[in-house]
């Protein structure tokens, strides 16, 4: 992949463009045009909890290979996800994902009882492999998913915001009761800028910028495949 000609700012512009292009892909269009039923919302909620777990795995690998100061930056990001913000009464995001399932009629046991999608498992493995690449590729592969979920960067709203609006429309569940979705609508705006913080110091060569673009592009490719598997799963369930 070739970098854009305008250095770091040009690279950032390209990354934002790539994130917006996700929503023009067939898998994303299928997913955001789904009609949610209770059964579909339940299965989607369960699979997204597995997705959150995979994000924690991947960021752990990224942190392990990154320079010390970037390890600290990643930990600041992951502290919200793994521990929450106790001072604000906010729980970790795995707990939030399970608790959000309650509004769809799920118990905590349902998250343990239901298996991961086979296609989802393959995508999770692919993301872990990306997280084990050179650290710039690896951090881009994980951070680009935060950018793709930032309402500040995505025209028409982030994926979390769109899904939340669909659930409110189809099931009458307000966003404030979708506690995990609502949290990501807010937090991923903040987290989306992590990659630019890294790039300002470390993406000072074309090789480094190309590594970031490559890691991001491959992660978004996996993301499209994963959303396609989610759309497939939802389509197998009754639409009424």
Regions found by a protein language model. Name each.
Residues 2, 203-240:
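Acidic, carboxylate-rich catalytic segments that either coordinate divalent cations
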Residues 2-28:
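Acidic, low-complexity proline/glycine-rich segments
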Residues 28-33, 169-171, 203-204:
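Short, charged/polar, low-complexity loop and linker segments
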Residues 6-11, 72-180, 221, 225, ...:
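Active-site-proximal alpha-helical scaffolds that flank and shape metal-associated catalytic sites
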Residues 59-63, 98, 164-168, 196, ...:
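Amphipathic alpha-helical segments within well-ordered protein domains
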Residues 16-23, 32, 36-65, 137-161, ...:
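Alpha-helical bundle segments that constitute or directly flank the non-heme di-iron/ferroxidase center
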Residues 67, 71, 108, 203-210:
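Structural helix-adjacent loops and short alpha-helical linkers that scaffold large soluble proteins
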Residues 173-216:
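Accessory, usually C-terminal, subdomains that scaffold auxiliary metal cofactors
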């Amino acid at each position: 992949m070739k970098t854009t000609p305008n250095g770091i700012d040009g690279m950032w512009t390209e990354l934002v463009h790539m994130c917006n292009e996700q929503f023009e892909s067939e898998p994303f269009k299928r997913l955001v045009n789904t009609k949610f039923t209770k059964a579909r919302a339940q299965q989607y909620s369960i699979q997204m909890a597995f997705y959150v777990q995979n994000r924690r795995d991947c960021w752990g690998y990224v942190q392990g290979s990154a320079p010390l100061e970037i390890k600290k930056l990643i930990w600041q990001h992951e502290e919200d996800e793994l521990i929450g913000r106790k001072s604000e009464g906010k729980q970790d995001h795995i707990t939030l994902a399970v608790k959000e399932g309650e509004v769809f009629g799920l118990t905590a046991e349902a998250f343990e009882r239901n298996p991961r999608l086979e296609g989802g498992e393959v995508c999770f493995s692919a993301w872990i492999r990306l997280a084990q690449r050179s650290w710039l590729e690896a951090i881009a592969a994980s951070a680009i998913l935060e950018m793709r979920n930032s309402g500040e960067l995505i025209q028409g709203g982030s994926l979390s915001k769109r899904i939340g609006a669909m659930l409110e429309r189809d099931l009458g569940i307000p966003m404030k009761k979708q506690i995990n979705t609502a949290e990501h609508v807010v937090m991923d705006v903040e987290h989306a800028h992590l990659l630019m913080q890294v790039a300002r110091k470390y993406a000072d060569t074309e090789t480094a910028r190309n590594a970031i673009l490559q890691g991001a592009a491959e992660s978004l490719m996996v993301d499209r495949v994963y959303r396609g598997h989610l759309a497939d799963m939802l389509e197998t369930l009754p639409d009424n």
